[in-house]
Amino acid sequence: MVPLPWELEEDILSRLAAQSLVRFRSVCKRWNYLFDEKSFIKNHFARACPQFIFMTDSNIYSIEIIGLDGVDPTIKLRVLDSSGIPYRDWKFAYITITACDGFLFCNSWASPKGTAFWNPWLKQVKWIEYEDKGFNVCGLGYDNTRDGKVYKILGYLMCRPEDGSSYVYHQRVAIYDCASHAFKFIEISNKDWFLTDVTRFSVSLNGNLYWLSPIPNTDDFLIQCFDFSREICKPFCLLPCRKFDAFDLLVSFQGR
């Protein structure tokens, strides 16, 4: 039997579901090495079918859209195994869930457990350890100017003044590096507005974090961006629509 050209073999593998790739790691060393290559991971993300997580009090569902580019797309619904899912016993009350690259990060300000890194498709959970359990997660991203992808979490801690002059706690914005397990405090202007808006509804896209933010004393809105490569918050664009509802949501579709 004539083997397939390697380029074709790699192309076929990049179109398979993540669950299948995990099983295929043991087929041969070449495939095992391939699945860790950055170019393969990038192609796999680009070709992945849109999937959603739907949570109820009793079950957690995976919703997959098949044939989205065709004239008659279909929806495939299946129940996910809920064993080991972070904060499942809490029924996700007081839980903040943010997403990046198909992974979910679960955090609760009311629990001493901290933040969980959750891969719902492979049923894998890893708890992110940090010394201060009072870290409140706002969103996550990574430095998109580097070759290696190191996830970073944007959030804040409740801190006392360093000189101990007061028992009044105040919010300090910080970045948690998932590789070095280190915190870095940063200064943000209009901090109160920043923390309220980014914690409510934020979207991670290509390493940066985006969210809707009202312009104080006006009815106008803009999209704010936190750039993890420069570790700064900056305006992205002014929205043409004005404020009209109490709930405004920013979403991304197929990475755009």
Swiss-Prot record:
Gene3D superfamilies: 1.20.1280.50. InterPro entries: F-box-assoc_dom_typ1 (IPR006527), F-box-assoc_interact_dom (IPR017451), F-box-like_dom_sf (IPR036047), F-box_dom (IPR001810), SCF_F-box_component (IPR050796). SUPFAM superfamilies: F-box domain. The lineage of its organism: Eukaryota, Viridiplantae, Streptophyta, Embryophyta, Tracheophyta. It comes from Arabidopsis thaliana. Residues 1-44 form the F-box domain. PANTHER family: BNACNNG10540D PROTEIN (PTHR31672), F-BOX PROTEIN CPR30-LIKE (PTHR31672:SF13). Signal peptide: none annotated. This is Putative F-box protein At3g51171.
